[in-house]
């Protein structure tokens, strides 16, 4: 079973579901995060497969991915326009924490 970062449940869920009113975006983020952890690499999956795995419509998956990209919580890459997207889950709170730790070490 994939581990869920505390930040995802404590902060991100409220932000996406409550503030942004995008619960499907939270489900997509959660599923992609778990799948990336299982595979150990970015997740290559079509909108249709993504939708079926989560139990949502294809158009809802497309909108959710677009929102997550806009929020910079997801990076999407495609080799060609018609290629299957490859998703990398971004965790900006971890990056910020690392920057602060490095800054603290450099100041010593």
Report each predicted region and the residues it spans.
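Short recognition helix of helix-turn-helix/winged-helix DNA-binding domains
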Residues: 1-53, 82, 107
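Winged-helix/helix-turn-helix nucleic-acid-interaction surface
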Residues: 62-108
């Amino acid at each position: 079973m994939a581990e869920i970062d505390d930040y995802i449940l404590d902060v991100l869920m409220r932000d996406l579901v409550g503030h942004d009113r995008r619960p499907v975006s939270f489900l997509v983020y959660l599923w992609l995060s778990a799948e990336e952890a299982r595979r150990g690499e970015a997740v290559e999956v079509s909108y249709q497969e993504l939708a079926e795995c989560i139990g949502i419509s294809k158009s809802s998956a497309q909108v959710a991915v677009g929102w997550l990209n806009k929020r910079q919580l997801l990076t999407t890459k495609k080799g060609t326009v018609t290629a299957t997207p490859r998703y990398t889950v971004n965790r900006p709170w971890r990056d910020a924490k690392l920057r602060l730790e490095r800054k603290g070490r450099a100041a010593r």
